[in-house]
Design a protein with these regions (language model features):
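Residues that cap or initiate secondary-structure elements
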Residues: 39-41, 57, 70-72, 92, ...
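Positively charged n-region of N-terminal signal peptides that target proteins for export
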Residues: 1-6
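Bacterial N-terminal signal peptides
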Residues: 8-19
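N-terminal cleavable signal peptides for secretion/export
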Residues: 22-77
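A short, structured loop/turn motif at beta-sheet edges
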Residues: 24-26, 52-61, 87-92, 198-200, ...
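Hydrophobic/aromatic beta-strand elements that line small-molecule binding cavities or substrate pockets
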Residues: 48-54, 81-87, 111, 229-231
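Mature, soluble, non-transmembrane domains
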Residues: 97-270
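Hydrophobic/aromatic-rich structural module bridging two neighboring secondary-structure elements via a short loop
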Residues: 64-116
Length: 270
């Protein structure tokens, strides 16, 4: 189960990188990725991940759906789904509902995150009861994390840390150690999958080591990365591929469908 937990975390963190824009406003869109076990061109398909980012007049609405059905060994089969619905009020607050189902066992978590007294106050409702926590004021909410990542890459930063809130991962904060690399990963889709063109003028290959920075279980931060990510991010805020290495499991995600969404026409602020 440790491998599956790592895989779920890897994909949740990876999804944070699948939207945003450094040179303009974040462009809303719906992106669908095919997940394959390993990086070989003939790697077995094990699922999909879909992220839908919608801009509203009040902020951002995020819908994320992950589905994995895989046989990791002849005797170990896994069925895992994760659904997230979240609303972010332009960095001021975040409200979400997440439902995960592992081999038929369902777990639902709801929560809100708000700035108070110089910190992020997290209120979570789990099947085990309320689970409040406090996160550093430097923690970025999902869309805010996207914006910060892209601004730093576009600005020429070679390496930098990023604290990001991942609502699916027990409502905790994660430290992303970002490095610009010489080449991206998962640039070549399998022969059976058509290549989807990403609207952009620039792109940045990167690698990210992920550790848990704000645990909610009282344990110290992780000493080693629990997930590493490799990919290429375009200035339109979209990735065409990503490799997530969770130790015992490596998953490659390839973009298979992309739809750009229109921004709403909102009344001017008073």
């Amino acid at each position: 189960m440790k491998g599956i937990a790592g895989l779920a975390l890897a994909l949740a963190v990876a999804a944070l990188l699948m939207a945003g824009s450094a040179s303009a406003q974040i462009r809303p869109h719906r992106a669908e990725y095919t997940l394959r076990l390993g990086t070989a061109l003939n790697a077995t398909r094990i699922g999909t991940i879909v992220q839908d980012i919608e801009l509203t007049c009040d902020g951002w609405r995020i819908r994320r759906a992950l589905s994995v059905d895989a046989s990791l060994t002849p005797s170990f089969k896994v069925s895992f789904t994760s659904r997230l619905e979240g609303d972010e009020a332009r960095g001021k607050a975040f409200t979400w509902r997440a439902v995960q189902v592992l081999n038929g066992a369902e777990r639902e978590v709801k929560g809100t995150v708000k700035k108070k007294d110089g910190t992020w106050q997290v209120e979570r409702t789990t099947p085990d009861g309320p689970a409040p926590s406090v996160l550093s004021s430097f923690t970025h909410m999902p869309v805010g994390a996207l914006d910060w990542l892209l601004r730093r890459l576009a600005g020429g930063s070679e390496s930098f840390p990023l604290l990001a809130f991942v609502p699916e991962a027990e409502g905790g904060a994660f430290l992303l150690e970002v490095k610009r690399t010489a080449a991206g990963a998962a640039d070549t889709p399998p022969p059976s999958q058509r290549r989807v063109e990403v609207p952009a003028k620039q792109s940045w290959p990167f690698s990210i080591a992920v550790t848990r920075a704000g645990r909610t279980d009282g344990k110290p931060p992780d000493a080693k990365p629990i997930v590493t990510l490799r990919g290429r991010l375009y200035d339109s805020g979209i990735m065409d591929g990503l490799v997530a290495d969770a130790g015992v499991i490596t998953v490659a995600a390839h973009l298979r469908d992309l739809k750009m969404r229109e921004a709403p026409t909102c009344p001017a602020a008073n």
